[in-house]
Design a protein with these regions (language model features):
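Extended, low-hydrophobicity, polar/charged segments
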Residues: 1-191
């Protein structure tokens, strides 16, 4: 009963990069979204939220079962209900660096996985930059390798927009006397 990327990879004797991780999240309005990243990559939830222009949260195991009809560990992108939006990381593009290649994915059936699944043929998701960057990745602008360094935060900016002002009905009047929600931000110096 292999559920995790590591367990499936070890059982099949293939690298994690030959698997696709399928992660169900819930966006605003209870919209189910299936995010796909290569097995050796991690989903960057903030990137997905920014792409969706929505707040997101991981689906609870009972939601996964209700929406996809299978328990966590066997979720895959093939044959998901049309109500589920499927978004794959750019690294899975069939016309990308790796090209169209076969992957192992969850089968959306208990204790089962599918092999030979090709993105673009067996599943046609939309694509976005969804994965966490890591040391050695190429810069998308110049191609130089990314280096990861230990740093100290000296300041931060949180662009809150109207997330808090709109529900609180905190408004300002424009020149014509029309109300608009206050656009908020939080700016800090130091950790």
């Amino acid at each position: 009963e292999q559920r995790t990327i590591e367990e499936v990879s070890g059982f099949l004797g293939i690298p994690a990069s030959s698997l696709i991780k399928s992660l169900l999240v819930i966006a605003d309005g209870n919209q189910p979204v299936l995010a796909l990243v290569r097995g050796d990559h991690e989903l960057h939830e903030a990137k997905l939220a920014r792409h969706l222009m929505s707040e997101i949260r991981p689906a609870h195991p009972d939601e996964v079962a209700e929406i996809l009809g299978v328990e966590v560990g066997f979720v895959g992108p093939v044959g998901v209900p049309v109500s589920v939006r499927v978004i794959a990381d750019d690294s899975l593009r069939p016309d990308g660096v790796g090209g169209a290649r076969p992957y192992v994915v969850g089968a959306n059936q208990p204790h089962a996985h599918l092999s030979g699944v090709v993105v673009g043929r067996d599943v046609t998701p939309e694509f976005a930059d969804l994965r966490e960057a890591r040391a050695g990745d190429a810069c998308p602008h110049c191609g130089a390798q990314l280096q990861v360094e230990q740093v100290l935060e000296i300041g931060n900016i949180f662009k809150l927009g109207t997330k808090y002002s709109a529900p609180l009905k905190a408004t300002i009047l424009d020149e014509s006397g029309k109300e608009h929600p206050i656009v908020m931000g939080s700016y800090g110096i130091g950790p």
